[in-house]
Swiss-Prot record:
Listed name of the protein: Large ribosomal subunit protein bL34c
Origin species: Arabidopsis thaliana
Transmembrane domains' residue ranges: none
HAMAP family per UniProt: Ribosomal_bL34
Subunit structure of this chain's protein: Part of the 50S ribosomal subunit.
GO cellular component: chloroplast; ribonucleoprotein complex; ribosome
An annotated Gene Ontology molecular function: structural constituent of ribosome
Main function: This protein binds directly to 23S ribosomal RNA.
Length: 157
């Protein structure tokens, strides 16, 4: 099976200074844009079918950049007008893939206070008496279930 493909890649990055940060960090977000075309030829059937032309764009974050809702996202546009399948349906023109951290920020850029809050809640849920305490506070209608879970951890000395 022979395969022929061409790829054109362009990338861009810009340096931004964040005046809100006290230590004057430089943020380096970067994005890449690539155009992929290709042609596949099968040796068993002497027909050639061109694979879809994709315009692919991805947003990458660096360790010094600010958290952005676009970091970890990947977008691809299908530029070909070919049909696929037996019933002749058109392929989708836009494909968006998002990483886990970009969707709900499970691991990145969480404050010390929010980490301490979850730690206090999980510590209460570990024991029988802690679970009973949370159950009583829920029955009472409390919004803050664990008020004593490191309240000053958001402030750094």
């Amino acid at each position: 099976m022979a395969s022929l493909s061409t790829s054109v890649v362009a990338s861009a990055s810009s340096r931004l200074w964040n005046p809100a940060a006290s230590n004057g960090k430089i943020c380096v977000p970067s994005a890449s844009l690539s155009l992929r075309t290709g042609c596949r030829r099968s040796s068993s059937s002497l027909t050639s079918s061109a694979s879809s032309q994709l315009l692919h764009c991805s947003f990458l974050s660096s360790p010094v950049s600010l958290a952005s809702p676009f970091s970890g996202l990947s977008i691809a546009f299908d530029l070909s007008s070919q049909t696929s399948g037996l019933n002749g349906q058109r392929r989708r023109g836009l494909v968006v893939r998002a990483g886990k951290a970009a969707l709900c920020q499970t691991k990145r850029s969480r404050s010390r206070k929010s980490l301490a809050r979850t730690h206090g809640f999980r510590r209460r849920m570990r024991t029988t008496s802690g679970r009973a305490t949370i159950k009583r506070r829920r029955a009472k209608g409390r919004w803050n279930l664990c008020p004593k879970s490191n309240p000053s951890s958001g402030k750094r000395a």
